Amino acid sequence: MYSKITLVLLFPLFLSSQIIIPNVGNGWRTKVQQAIEVIKKYDLHKYNVLTDECKQIDFGLASFATSDGKSTIILPVEVLNRGCINDIAACLVHESLHIQFSKAGNKLGEDFEEVICYRWELDFLHNVPNAERWLISNALYQIGVYSTR
């Protein structure tokens, strides 16, 4: 009896921690789920930020990932079609920090916030064994670009 009551009471908590991922595209949901598992496996802190801040992941035609600043991350179709799981994971890590800043009301300035988010992403990539060199190079490049603005 107690186990049924406990299950009923805890079930909404379980549901609230799930990120909604639409089942569209050619295996996109699976790729995003794999990326989330990579984050969980190699950086539990960043995984917790992602699951605390992001409630939904959508897909868009922009050439870069973005967020609504509230709880939704929009991944570029181009990134999903490329199929690099670590690239998808890096986007999720980066954008979840933007959401956290937005929810906290931080007014860091756009360029400074990008530097922090790319450093956060870079830190994640350094935790992933055999992370693609081009992902690390891109994060370093973006840190340089946004640092000099």
Which residue ranges define each predicted feature?
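Post-HExxH zinc-binding segment in Zn-dependent metallohydrolases
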Residues: 110-145
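Extracytoplasmic/secreted envelope proteins and their assembly/folding machinery
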Residues: 32-36, 90, 118-121
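Sec-dependent N-terminal signal peptides
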Residues: 4-14
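Flexible, surface-exposed loop/gating regions in the mature catalytic domains
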Residues: 105-108
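Active-site recognition of the HExxH zinc-binding catalytic motif
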Residues: 90-103
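Short pre-active-site segment immediately N-terminal to the catalytic Zn-binding motif
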Residues: 75-92
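Auxiliary, metal-adjacent structural segments of Zn-dependent hydrolase domains
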Residues: 18-73, 77-80
